[in-house]
Amino acid sequence: MGFRVLVLVVMATTSALPFTFFEEPGRSPFRPALRSEEAQALRHGLTLLLARRADGQPPDMRQPEMRRPEVRQLEFAELSVGQRRWDVDQCMYYCLTGVVGYSYTECQTMCT
């Protein structure tokens, strides 16, 4: 919402503020400083930027996204003794209560 308001303010500012305030004979003191083609191109670009933002497409000038560092799973040897014991117990529990029906020795072989 804030981005849209900012773009609307910029669009309104480009059409209202860029005036020269010196008087020349036969000319209005409020003649736009930008040529109409430049102002129209600027408004068109801002409108496209707003449309992309509304569609969820990333604008061309945004900063690259920050990548999260990959979280590496600890190897079994790097785990603490308590953590290893809990993992083995959990593995044994799921192995023995699972649908496949492994025996205790098969589960112990797989989990340790």
From Swiss-Prot:
Keywords: Cleavage on pair of basic residues, Disulfide bond, Ion channel impairing toxin, Neurotoxin, Potassium channel impairing toxin, Secreted, Signal, Toxin
Source organism superkingdom: Eukaryota
Keyword Secreted included in the entry's annotation: yes
Tissue: Expressed by the venom duct.
Keyword Lipoprotein: no
GO cellular component: extracellular region
Location(s) in or outside the cell: Secreted
UniProt GO molecular function: potassium channel regulator activity; toxin activity
Major subcellular location class: secreted
Coiled coil: none
Similarity comment text for this entry: Belongs to the conotoxin R superfamily.
Annotated domain remarks: The cysteine framework is XIV (C-C-C-C).
Protein name: Conotoxin vil14.4
Source species: Conus villepinii
